[in-house]
Design a protein with these regions (language model features):
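N-terminal ligand-binding/catalytic initiation module
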Residues: 1-242
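Glycine-rich phosphate/diphosphate-binding loop of Rossmann-like nucleotide-binding domains
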Residues: 240, 245-316
Length: 316
């Protein structure tokens, strides 16, 4: 059976040309008619998670309709296709897996990376990559991190206008330290403790180098990497590709913009304002670094975590 991404909006003559006669109902719907019909179906779902599953299926079956629907109902549907609802989808990723979307790169594939990327026919403008070690506030979800990559790219296309056909979600499977996943027969990722240290970075070197060979102009976004790796990866590859880490730099950019806007309204400046950031994880440190640069005086920005004020003479 032939397939189409237009569904019932496909004109009669085109159905005939593609050999689709009898494969769909008679009526030719406009895109707006399709959108209203699907929106009623989404609205009738009993839970946000059921809505998420329906929208993911729509994204696979008819991406034109999916993005048209999301753009027309953006404030309502963004929390459904991304946070907070995507968290449950990431936790249940293996149970829900039906078809491939994006690429999974296992450590065992380390010598096949060029062939894997060559199998992707389209040109790619944006890649969101995750190793699933720190997914949202849920911890190590292994290949469940793929859900975050898919959801983030859907946001970029729906709200940012990036062509979805030129995006690629990419999950790096280096094992998992989650005991539940290691013992779960349904888990589809590599069931072994995570590789780390030089072995981990050697694999990431190979991944980034292969990406650069295939798409040298691509934007590479790191998503939900553990704090011990996040900043190191940025520093390691900053001269290789155009890249950023959303948890560090994206959050910092938005938070800094809010601080600057608030100070402007208050008639003050960042250089004259002491800043205390509660939380010294990837996001907190990223915000602190950006505000310190903007202020021109790092001593104006302080970090406070569960052990107190972060300072050089602190034991931990």
């Amino acid at each position: 059976m032939n397939d189409t991404m237009m569904g019932t909006s496909l004109p009669y003559a085109e159905r005939k040309r593609q050999g689709l006669m009898g494969r769909m109902p008679h009526k030719e719907e406009s895109l707006s008619q399709q959108r209203r019909r699907i929106y009623r179906l989404v609205s009738a779902m009993q839970s946000p998670f059921d809505q998420h599953l329906l929208l993911r299926q729509l994204q696979e079956d008819n991406s034109v309709l999916f993005y048209d629907l999301v753009r027309h109902h953006l404030p309502e549907l963004l929390p459904i296709i991304y946070t907070p609802v995507v968290g449950e989808a990431c936790q249940r990723h293996s149970d829900l897996y039906l078809r491939s979307h994006g690429l999974y790169l296992s450590w065992h594939d380390r010598d096949e990376l060029d062939d894997i990327f060559a199998s992707v026919e389209q040109e790619v403008d944006v890649i969101v990559i995750s190793d699933g070690e720190r997914v949202l506030g849920l911890g190590d979800l292994g290949i469940g991190g793929m859900g975050i990559c898919i959801g983030k790219l859907a946001l970029y296309s729906a709200a940012g206008g990036i062509n979805p056909a030129r995006t690629l979600p990419l999950c790096v499977d280096v094992g998992t330290n989650n005991p539940a996943l290691l013992e779960d027969d349904s888990y589809l990722g590599w069931q072994a403790p995570r590789i780390d240290g030089e072995t981990y970075y050697h694999f990431m070197d190979k991944v980034v180098a292969a990406i650069r060979r295939r798409w040298p102009e691509v934007v590479l976004q790191f998503e939900d990497f553990a704090g011990k790796h996040a900043a190191n990866l940025l520093a390691r590859y900053r001269d290789e590709l155009c890249m950023f880490n959303d948890d560090i730099q994206g959050t910092a950019a938005v938070a800094s913009a809010c601080v600057l806007a608030g100070l402007q309204q208050a008639g003050s400046t960042l250089a004259d304002t002491p800043v205390l950031i509660v939380g010294a994880g990837s996001a907190g440190c990223g915000i602190a670094a950006m505000l310190a640069r903007l202020a021109g005086s790092p001593e104006r920005v302080q970090l406070f975590d569960q052990d107190g004020l972060v300072c050089l003479d602190r034991a931990n």
